[in-house]
């Protein structure tokens, strides 16, 4: 199966299935001399980990990461870093009843059409369980970006259903189970999740990811534009159906006089572009938003077909998230960090000697 890798200079390749023995990834391109421990990676893995609150799937995976290679005495050696997480709480029997039935809204039907075979246990390779390795690799990138360049990558839940959360307080994000930055909406989010669990249904969400202190100049012309690569990375996250950079689709309602980010001697006057102009970072905060669909793994009966093409009605049993947007927050951070680290290394390789007389804010 192709398509298991992302990045050029900083390259991440993942492997493993939801109910397989383990998940793993190979991280190439990490410069030598970076202090990295398993504990550094575990912080973000614990934020994504299932079974940590009543609002997410009750599959209880410790997601303990092991560093297999590329780190010696707590420091990267410049060689490939191998990471592994063992699966310990698989309940494959939950899926035996659907091995010959295609769950509506899932990848069952398309995987079967493409490969002629599929791992029906929790979706196999198409499961969001795969993203644990992205988060582990992204933690390496986040640490490098922050320690080396002062770049901070953060994300939060800014919408669940029709509940809109204002980006008011980054510190609050880590203090509630929704990763919400808006304290005034916590009770509404709790009530909605209780309602969904009682109904056996799910809801969509919006996650906002912001990278601050990104230097100007990252990104390549035309096909490797920074915003194109960010959109590609974020769109590859399970359940993501839309990506916006900056004001995104909101620019449709703006005039050119409103949308352009004017420049003064003190810097930009606005950031409608989301920190990227012409596919290259402008030094403003990079802002992206992702829309995540409501999971199709719900207790509400739905129509589908079996292998024989016969119409059947099914209920998806198992342990699932009423809102996948909650655990998508650390995943979005990881994918943004992976892209930024890749482009920083590419910029250093090609343009390290470039000196500009333009001001940098």
Curated annotation (Swiss-Prot):
Reduced FMN (FMNH(2)). Transmembrane segments: none annotated. Belongs to the chorismate synthase family. This is Chorismate synthase. It comes from the Bacteria. GO terms for biological process: amino acid biosynthetic process; aromatic amino acid family biosynthetic process; chorismate biosynthetic process. The keyword Hydrolase does not apply. Pathway: Metabolic intermediate biosynthesis; chorismate biosynthesis; chorismate from D-erythrose 4-phosphate and phosphoenolpyruvate: step 7/7. FMN binds at residues 125-127, 238-239, 278, 293-297, 319. Homotetramer. It comes from Photorhabdus laumondii subsp. laumondii (strain DSM 15139 / CIP 105565 / TT01) (Photorhabdus luminescens subsp. laumondii). NADP(+) binds at residues 48, 54. GO terms for cellular component: cytosol.
């Amino acid at each position: 199966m192709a398509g298991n890798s992302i990045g050029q200079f900083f390259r991440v390749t993942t492997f493993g299935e939801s109910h397989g023995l383990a998940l793993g990834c190979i991280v190439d391109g990490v410069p030598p001399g970076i202090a990295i421990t398993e504990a550094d990676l575990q912080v973000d893995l614990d934020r994504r980990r299932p079974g940590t609150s009543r609002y997410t799937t009750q599959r209880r995976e410790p997601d303990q990461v092991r560093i297999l290679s590329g780190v010696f005495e707590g420091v990267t050696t410049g060689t490939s870093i191998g990471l592994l997480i063992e699966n310990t709480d698989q309940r494959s029997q939950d899926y035996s009843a659907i091995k010959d039935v295609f769950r509506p809204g899932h990848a069952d039907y398309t995987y079967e059409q493409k490969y002629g075979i599929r791992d029906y246990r929790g979706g196999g390779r198409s499961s969001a369980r795969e993203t644990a390795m992205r988060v582990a690799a992204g933690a390496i990138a986040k640490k490098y970006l922050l320690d080396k360049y002062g770049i901070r990558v953060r994300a939060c839940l800014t919408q669940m259903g029709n509940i809109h959360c204002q980006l008011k307080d980054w510190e609050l994000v880590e203090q509630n189970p929704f990763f919400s930055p808006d304290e005034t909406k916590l009770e509404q989010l709790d009530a909605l999740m209780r309602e969904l669990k009682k109904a056996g249904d799910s809801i969509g969400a919006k996650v906002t990811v912001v990278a601050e202190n990104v230097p100007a100049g990252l990104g390549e012309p035309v096909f490797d534009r920074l915003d194109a690569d960010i959109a590609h990375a974020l769109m590859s996250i399970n359940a993501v159906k839309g990506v916006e950079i900056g004001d995104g689709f909101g620019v449709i309602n703006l005039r050119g006089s409103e949308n352009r980010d004017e420049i003064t001697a003190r810097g930009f006057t606005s950031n409608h572009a989301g920190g990227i102009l012409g596919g290259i970072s402008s030094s403003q905060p990079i802002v992206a938003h992702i829309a995540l669909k409501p999971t199709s793994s719900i207790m509400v009966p739905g129509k589908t077909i079996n292998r024989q093409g016969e119409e059947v009605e099914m209920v998806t049993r198992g342990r699932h998230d009423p809102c996948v947007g909650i655990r998508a927050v650390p995943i979005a951070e990881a994918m943004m960090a992976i892209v930024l680290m890749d482009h920083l290394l590419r910029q250093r390789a090609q343009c390290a000697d470039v000196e500009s007389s333009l001001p940098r804010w």
